[in-house]
Amino acid sequence: MKLKTTIAALILLSAAVVANAQTVEKKALTLDGAKKVIAGAVAYAKKNNAPGGVIAVVDDGGNLIALERMDGTFAAGANISIGKARTAALFKRPTKMFEDTIKNGRTALIALPDTFFTPLQGGIPIVIDGQIVGAVGVSGAASAQQDEEIAIAGANVLAADAKISALTTDEKRKP
């Protein structure tokens, strides 16, 4: 009886090891992280005299985490910024790439449903340690170029935090 119990335990243990080997560690964007992205984007917008802007932050699945609409921004900017962020997250690319592709004649892209695809400049993936954890989308600044610059500034806040955090961790390991 003891032998059967030992064998059963070994089988279960080996199954757990196999199951564990089939998973990967995935980074996730938190609400705190999304708020930092928005704060960085708003600070950049104010510093560069943007007339307004809506900043949306989504997770890697395109789900809204946080949104801020600066004073003076048109109401439709909220949905547009969410669409830009969602597009950047789901396609893992800046949305300017899609806008440029359409401008260059690939008009079939505009047939994609707008709930998943907003091919307008201003959506930027948020990358931490090589993993896309979400995206930021901006709409309502002075131009599409400024939308993108504000989004980049927001995304870079977390990238900078990750580098600082990694540096601090590495420094602690040194004897």
Locations of the language-model features?
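Flexible, solvent-exposed loop/hinge segments and secondary-structure transition points
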Residues: 21-175
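Bacterial N-terminal signal peptides that target proteins for export
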Residues: 1-8
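Cleavable N-terminal signal peptides
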Residues: 8-9, 19
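N-terminal signal peptide c-region/cleavage motif recognized by signal peptidases
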Residues: 14-18
